[in-house]
Amino acid sequence: MNGIHSENGYTEIIKGIRIKTLCYGESMLMAEFLLRKDAVLPEHSHPNEQTGYLIKGKIRLFIEDAVRELVPGDSWNIATDAIHRAEILEDSVAIEVFSPVREDYLKFINDPDVVK
């Protein structure tokens, strides 16, 4: 398994970005992200549609040619295969849902006994 496990169930996947997979089903997966100020999520894309909700903090999200500064209560949608990246402007917490399931995030499930 890749990443650094912490006692609270989060795994650092990129410097300053920690994930905990909360639950998943047949066609979607939900994860919580702890994002440190000044962390950068590099430009990437994936075949999963992605929606998110910012609980705490402030981030700058780049999706294709659009740029948005997000604050608590804001949400977003990233289409399948859309190129995106993010800059973390304040310590932040976000919840994101991926469809179909991101198979690479199943290893970050907090409780191995979670039932689909």
Label the predicted regions:
Residues 1-27, 109-116:
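A short, N-terminal "cap"/entry segment at the start of jelly-roll beta-barrel domains
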Residues 31-45:
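Conserved short histidine dyad/triad with adjacent acidic residue
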Residues 48-59, 64:
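Glycine- and acidic-residue-biased ligand/ion/polar-headgroup-sensing regions
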Residues 55-56, 71-72, 90:
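A cytosolic small-molecule/anion-sensing beta-strand core signal
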Residues 58-60, 67, 83, 92-93:
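Structural motif
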Residues 65-80:
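Short acidic-glycine-tyrosine-enriched beta hairpin
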Residues 80-104:
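Ligand-binding loop in jelly-roll beta-barrel domains
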